[in-house]
Curated annotation (Swiss-Prot):
Belongs to the transferase hexapeptide repeat family. Residues 177-196 are annotated as: Disordered. This is Carnitine operon protein CaiE. CDD domains: LbH_paaY_like (cd04745). It comes from Escherichia coli O81 (strain ED1a). Keywords: Repeat, Transferase.
Length: 196
């Protein structure tokens, strides 16, 4: 793992969390219980404090950063999709930020809300509970349905289960020269399917 102290502050990672070896955590970073931090994620706590609360996930290539005297927070069971950028914002409990979205300084995403992929949430935005946000700049288009929230929670559960699976079986290796016969397919732990 790539952990770096900065001006005396050392990242704090709960022993039940999983941080991929290619992720980078610098300085004032706090990672809670059961959190998943994916490959190539950058959590750079060299100005503001970065907090990832219990059960949340920060997926591949995500960036977290913020200004001095601010906290960038991903709330409990938060779900941050591949390539998202969080800068000085607060993501509420059980909220989802879609792939390649950008959430700017002082923005607050409400609990159980969903930010659609590729959205841009402006600095200072104040969201409410259970909003579907989309666009550039993002705006609330409607409430998150019960089915959508259930789908989000299944996806988050997959990442929470992935923590244990990674602790148990992920290790560096050399590639095979060819595919073996009857190569098995990996299975998830829930019945979640992609949204159509």
């Amino acid at each position: 793992m790539s952990y770096y102290a900065f001006e005396g502050l050392i990242p704090v990672v709960h022993p039940t969390a999983f941080v991929h070896p290619s992720a980078v955590l610098i300085g004032d970073v706090i990672v809670g219980a059961g959190v998943y931090i994916g490959p190539l994620a950058s959590l750079r706590g060299d100005y503001g404090r970065l907090i990832v609360q219990a059960g949340a996930n920060i997926q591949d290539g995500c960036i977290m950063h913020g200004y001095c005297d601010t906290d960038t927070i991903v709330g409990e069971n938060g779900h941050i999709g591949h390539g998202a950028i969080l800068h000085g914002c607060v993501i509420g409990r059980d909220a989802l930020v879609g792939m390649n979205s950008v959430i700017m300084d002082g923005a607050v995403i409400g609990e159980e809300s969903i930010v659609a992929a590729m959205s841009f949430v402006k600095a200072g935005f104040r969201g409410e509970k259970r909003q579907l946000l989309m666009g550039t700049p993002a705006r609330a288009v409607r409430s998150v349905s019960d089915d959508e929230l259930h789908w989000k929670r299944l996806n988050t559960k997959e990442y929470q289960d992935l923590v244990g699976r990674c602790h148990a079986s992920l290790h560096e290796t050399q590639p095979l020269r060819q595919m073996e016969e009857n190569r098995p397919r990996l299975q998830g732990t829930t019945d979640v399917m992609p949204k159509r």
